[in-house]
Amino acid sequence: MFLVSKIFWLAVQPLSLAFLLSALGALVAFAGWRRIGATLSGLAAALLFVVLYTTAGGVALQVLEARFARPAEEPARISCIIVLGGALENEVTTSRGGIELNQAGERFLETLRLAIRHPDARIVVSGGDGSMTGDYEGEAAASERLFTAFGVSPERLVKENASRTTYENSLQTKDVLAREGLTDCVLVTSAFHMPRSMALFRKAGIPVTPWPVDYRTSGILRLGVDFSQPTSNAQITSTAVREWIGLVAYYLTGR
């Protein structure tokens, strides 16, 4: 199922879908069905316009980010911090060593801040190698270098390095919490990722307090055209589509 989901996403992410529509349109037109080919090419162009030059993706992502708000006040005491992977450049980190954070790096930075403010809290890092090849180190293992570099004792870290998806995060973390006797945890992940994460953690019977970070939208974005940042618009749209597909897929499969 893991490989199927990876291959499926390669095909249906917005830019890939636009390419496939365009290529299919060219093939159909070459075969003599020019009207159908023109229609497919037109759909590809329309999709590219929406992805590159509108705020549609940002608005869709904004809806997800608004689902769970961070508590207005930080708890006086935090005994357990769960942080989900997805914040490291696994390939670069594995080949070069060190820690290379990606755009979701605030997941680890906020966890580090909380860990320093709450020195008794255990830190559960949930995330292995989510690549198709499985050749990389995995985030839970690599993250120890980051936390210890800032003075966090290795004994405070609980590394769950087997999960490759959010669904596996929830199952593996449940086992870790039971084994370590940890309760009353805060869950740190990107705000857009929090709805899917909370749904799965609740389904697994893990009570957690959502602690969203890594916001990608302003929260006041409106639907419209935006010619100023096509690359950023494409990235945001791709992220939004992936999250919404993930939510729907987990719902349909009963997860």
Spans of model-derived segments:
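Hydrophobic membrane-insertion alpha-helices, especially the h-region
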Residues: T39-T54
